[in-house]
Regions:
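Short, charged, solvent-exposed linker or helix-capping segments at domain edges/interfaces
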Residues: 52-62, 238-239
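Conserved GNAT acetyl-CoA-binding A-motif
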Residues: 2-12, 179-191
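Conserved active-site tyrosine of GNAT-family acetyltransferases
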Residues: 16-21, 25, 201-203
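A short beta-loop-alpha structural element at the N-terminal edge
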Residues: 81-95
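Conserved acetyl-CoA-binding loop-helix of GNAT-fold acetyltransferases
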Residues: 1, 158, 164-181, 200, ...
């Protein structure tokens, strides 16, 4: 009440759902087998303003039309002119250059060298990139919960002149393969509703849509609705 927030958001284990339901929270999305490949997680919300609950209907319509179509799962090889790898502390300055050209604002301080350096050193986040002639042109990251064996696939940024080459798909596939080696069991993302290309990337990569967080995240200068996608992994199947 002190800051006049119009939405309260919580990501909690389904074990605690009754407490939140009793306090007036509603489910906006859910991911099964989120914790160690066993316990589900719920994305809950409590609104203080009816206006905050109104989604961007135009973007919703475009997104739903995408879901009607069968996903395209054709795998493409990365062109020999480009290379993909895991990034290190030595790449931080180049990462910031890419992020600043893609995002006006961001929910986390990805423009700050110290934030990126510490997240890499503490093994909280793994960063990946695509380079051309030694220059970093695309970045993504996996925010890893090593104890619970899940990872958020996020921070996808491709320099404008290199878009249209499915770099996000290549980065996503590379991240999945690297994390699978470390026994991660659930991958997920929270993607901007209005970014049809990113939603299509996860749809075509076998992720399942599980809900939309209405006007949830401050990004690129606005508070936007976000779609939740997930993929459960096991040694034998992908769900």
């Amino acid at each position: 009440h002190e800051f006049s927030y119009t939405k309260i958001f919580a990501k909690v284990s389904s074990l605690f759902a009754p407490l939140f339901f009793n306090a007036g929270y509603i489910i906006e999305a859910a991911i099964p087998r989120f914790f160690k490949g066993e316990q589900d997680v719920l994305f809950l919300a409590k609104y203080k303003s009816s206006e905050r609950q109104i989604p961007e209907y135009d973007s919703f319509e475009v997104f739903q039309n995408m879901l009607v179509n069968v996903p395209s799962v054709n795998k493409m090889q990365l062109d020999n002119d480009f290379s993909i790898r895991k990034l290190t502390i030595d790449d931080v300055s180049s990462m910031i250059v890419v992020f600043k050209q893609v995002f006006e604002t961001y929910p986390f301080p990805i423009f700050e060298p110290l934030f990126l350096t510490e997240s890499i050193q503490e093994n909280k986040t793994q960063y990946f990139g695509i380079s051309c002639e030694g220059n970093l042109i695309a970045v993504s990251s996996a925010e890893c919960d090593n104890a619970e064996q899940n990872a958020e696939m996020t921070d996808f940024a491709v320099l404008p002149r290199y878009r249209g080459k499915r770099f996000a798909s290549h980065l996503l596939s590379y991240m999945e393969n690297e994390l699978f080696k470390s026994n991660f069991k659930t991958f997920y993302t929270i993607s901007r509703l209005k970014s049809l290309s990113m939603n299509r990337t996860f749809y075509n990569s076998g992720y399942k849509y599980s809900g939309t967080l209405i006007k949830n995240t401050q990004i690129s200068g606005n508070i936007e609705s976000m779609n939740v996608w997930y993929k459960n992994i096991s040694t034998n199947t992908q769900e």
